[in-house]
Amino acid sequence: MSKRLFTSESVTEGHPDKICDAISDTILDAMLTEDPQARVAVETVVTTGLVHVVGEVRTSGYVEIPQLVRDTLKEIGFTSSDMGFDGTTCGVSVSIGAQSPEIGAGVDTSHEVRGSSSTDEDDRQGAGDQGLMFGYATNETPEYMPLPISVAHRLSRRLTEVRKEEIVTGLRPDGKTQVTFEYDDAGTPVRLDTVVISTQHDPERTQDELRELLSEHVVGHVLADESLKPFVTEDLNLLVNPSGSFILGGPAGDAGLTGRKIIVDTYGGMARHGGGAFSGKDPSKVDRSAAYATRWVAKNIVAAGLADRAEVQVAYAIGVARPVGLYVETFGTEKAPVEDIQRAVAEVFDLRPASILRELDLLRPIYAQTAAYGHFGRNDLDLPWERLDKVEELKKAVGGN
């Protein structure tokens, strides 16, 4: 049996790119609170002492963007210039323009409605852009996520928890985690090989102290879960701040940008990605809503016992309501013919944008909570695309062939 090692990473909410995702999604949520039909595309850039918010918006509401930016930074933990960034005193610049009327028209009145006499309301809304989106699920974990990204997220969330609750003192907001699992030839995880923890910290903290404290309170805490014990061996390779001191972090260490952690946001590299980011985009943008919908589809396929792993691709043309492509991949793990599974998916799930918005109830301020620690497999959140409400319909549709 060959030794195959697969790695996924996560980052904490204090990572510069994740700061930007949080700001963009906080602004989005505020706009959806004021106007559920708001069209929002907000990008954030952070650098030393300064936050830039840019984008295009169409809304009947008003939100105080600079205050939202400062509140988000302080909630993450950037409250002092001593750590290189202070949400109270940093500069905030805002450059928000109007959504292109041509894009807006294509979303409001789809190609189908403009070109025919269709009276189906779900045909009225066109896709906000062309593109391809992927959803994925696997039975490796109870949350139907790949094990490496699941554990990486648990570690990064715990790293933030011990900082905020002062279980470990002297930590700062920026941090990253990475895990490597050994897989057998059947594609099953068999052993945890390497864990990497990098965390920003106060100058007074030594690396020996950090290794001891994080080994106990972060790594040990997470790996004590009964479901993970079979993967842990004595030869686990644990690396804590392997580059040495990490005092300067956050925006003072690296500039950050919305949408630059798309693999962290999804499946840790275990599945394909269409390239579109999520944060700062209202759900008329299929980059976001269709990626959520295909996760919903894939998760229900696996939960229905139709495959051990499932990846679903959907594709759209701008201004067109009906998808131009649907593709189901089961990697040889299917329990029924793939063509029957794909036919059942097309029968059970309506992937037109208007239907996705209605079925998943997406015109709500639910997005800021997803800005860090992944958009999928979040048992700590009540996310509509994680529901297993189509399992029986899929079974019936496949069985009725």
Curated annotation (Swiss-Prot):
Manner of cofactor binding, per the entry note: Binds 2 divalent ions per subunit.
Subunit text: Homotetramer; dimer of dimers.
Enzyme Commission code: 2.5.1.6
Gene transcribed to yield this protein: metK
GO CC annotation: cytoplasm
One Pfam match: S-AdoMet_synt_M
Residues at which L-methionine binds: 56, 99, 254, 285
Protein name as it appears in the record: S-adenosylmethionine synthase
Binding site for Mg(2+): 17
Enzyme class name: transferase
Signal sequence range: none
Binding of ATP, residues: 15, 174-176, 254, 260-261, 277, 281
The species this protein was found in: Corynebacterium urealyticum (strain ATCC 43042 / DSM 7109)
Biological function: Catalyzes the formation of S-adenosylmethionine (AdoMet) from methionine and ATP. The overall synthetic reaction is composed of two sequential steps, AdoMet formation and the subsequent tripolyphosphate hydrolysis which occurs prior to release of AdoMet from the enzyme.
GO MF annotations, alphabetized: ATP binding; magnesium ion binding; methionine adenosyltransferase activity
Region annotation (Disordered) ranges: 101-132
Cofactor: Mg(2+); K(+)
One of the GO BP terms on file: one-carbon metabolic process
